[in-house]
């Protein structure tokens, strides 16, 4: 929740009618999900009952964890932090794209979440391997990064960056420097 602050990327004037929340609502410690609606939608359900849930509805421990997580988001200003650090991360990834012919596309820029698409030829954006295969050289990059304490998620030709909202600026910078170095090594082979 709030990693990408995607609903805010269209500006404050764009109001959402309905939003679903889940894993991040409790910091992924307990299962809890919610559907948050605006006043217009809420009024509809005052007269038209929606029968859902039962077993896990309103579980007190999960709700308490959700409340604590929401307080932490506000108290620690994690949303603002996600926007700022995510913006810096995305700018650095765009610079990496200029330096590395393996990078075909960088997607994200709305918070601490981004995807790098790796290609064998940037001009035609040919993937390194057919989807959903992970190219061996990319699997090697991930293993090297992990041996140095940095975890990059991979799906096929995609590197997924989703650092924790509480990551320190120097840790994020170090991870991006490492990624730059590992991409350079990958291009040399």
Task: Label the model's feature ranges.
Residues 1-189:
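Conserved N-terminal phosphate-binding loop of PLP-dependent enzymes in the Aspartate aminotransferase
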């Amino acid at each position: 929740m709030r990693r990408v602050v995607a609903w805010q990327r269209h500006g404050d004037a764009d109001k959402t009618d309905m939003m679903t929340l889940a894993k991040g609502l409790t910091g992924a410690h307990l299962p809890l999900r919610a559907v948050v609606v605006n006043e217009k939608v809420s009024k509809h359900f005052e007269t038209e009952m929606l029968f859902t849930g039962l077993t896990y509805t309103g579980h007190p421990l999960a709700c308490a964890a959700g409340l604590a997580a929401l307080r932490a988001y506000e108290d620690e200003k994690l949303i603002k932090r996600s926007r700022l650090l995510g913006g810096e991360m995305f700018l650095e990834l765009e610079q990496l794209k200029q330096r590395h012919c393996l990078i075909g596309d960088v997607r994200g820029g709305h918070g601490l979440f981004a995807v790098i698409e790796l290609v064998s030829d940037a001009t035609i954006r040919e993937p390194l391997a057919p989807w959903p295969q992970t190219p061996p050289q990319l699997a090697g990059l991930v293993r090297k990064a992990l041996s140095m304490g940095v975890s990059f998620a991979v799906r096929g030709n995609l590197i997924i960056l989703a650092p924790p909202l509480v990551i320190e600026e120097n840790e994020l910078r170090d991870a991006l420097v490492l990624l730059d170095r590992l991409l350079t090594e990958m291009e040399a082979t």
